[in-house]
Amino acid sequence: IVSPPVCGNELLEVGEECDCGTPENCQNECCDAATCKLKSGSQCGHGDCCEQCKFSKSGTECRESMSECDPAEHCTGQSSECPADVFHKNGQPCLDNYGYCYNGNCPIMYHQCYALWGADVYEAEDSCFESNTKGNYYGYCRKENGIKIPCAPEDVKCGRLYCKDNSPGQNNPCKMFYSNEDEHKGMVLPGTKCGDGKVCSNGHCVDVATAY
């Protein structure tokens, strides 16, 4: 059963152009609260691309860029709504070829080390990642049926993340994070560059052309 639209309930329903509540409570200068229609001369009553009852000018930014792989969206000048959030395609090089776009982000190991440990912590030397071939409680590439699968030699940069700590008072060339509560935390993130033209996918270092 579909209830008929009710003007004044602050829900935009079928047949309504706006709904700002009852005439006594309406705070929207663009909307006629008695009819739930836009007032004469108004193009819109709400939305990220609605300013003073008019569509925002074409090109007005309505959603900021979150990363190099997630460009800003801009109003069209024909609608009160911001266009859908779109990303650059997965696999597009980013951050001066240090990474590849993945779902709107540019995952690189340096940023992941920074998120875990803060400043002065960087991606560790390749030798540190060899521990991921052990298949022990922390050094592995993925889990299958609860069993930790060791990394193949070519996949070691798609398992546990290793960082080099250069912060004051620290000298840890192979710093890693492990938690029993969250075993995924401290693993290299999917989509991270693991070699030239290669990214991490399901614990494997694969060609970026075939990953997506």
UniProtKB/Swiss-Prot annotation:
It comes from Gloydius halys. The lineage of its organism: Eukaryota, Metazoa, Chordata, Craniata, Vertebrata. GO terms for molecular function: toxin activity. Pfam families: ADAM_CR, Disintegrin. One of its GO terms (cellular component) is extracellular region. The keyword Signal does not apply. Expressed by the venom gland. A motif (D/ECD-tripeptide) lies at residues 68-70. It is found in: Secreted. Inhibits human platelet aggregation stimulated by collagen with an IC(50) of 420 nM. Negative results: does not inhibit platelet aggregation stimulated by ADP. InterPro entries: ADAM_Cys-rich, Disintegrin_CS, Disintegrin_dom, Disintegrin_dom_sf. Belongs to the venom metalloproteinase (M12B) family. P-III subfamily. P-IIIb sub-subfamily. PANTHER family: ADAM A DISINTEGRIN AND METALLOPROTEASE DOMAIN (PTHR11905), DISINTEGRIN AND METALLOPROTEINASE DOMAIN-CONTAINING PROTEIN 28 (PTHR11905:SF32). Monomer. Residues 4-90 form the Disintegrin domain. SUPFAM superfamilies: Blood coagulation inhibitor (disintegrin) (SSF57552). Disulfide bonds join 7-26, 18-36, 62-82, 69-94, 101-106, 113-128, 151-158, 163-174, 200-205. Gene3D superfamilies: 3.40.1620.60, Disintegrin domain. Keywords: Cell adhesion impairing toxin, Disulfide bond, Hemostasis impairing toxin, Platelet aggregation inhibiting toxin, Secreted, Toxin. This is Disintegrin-like halysetin.
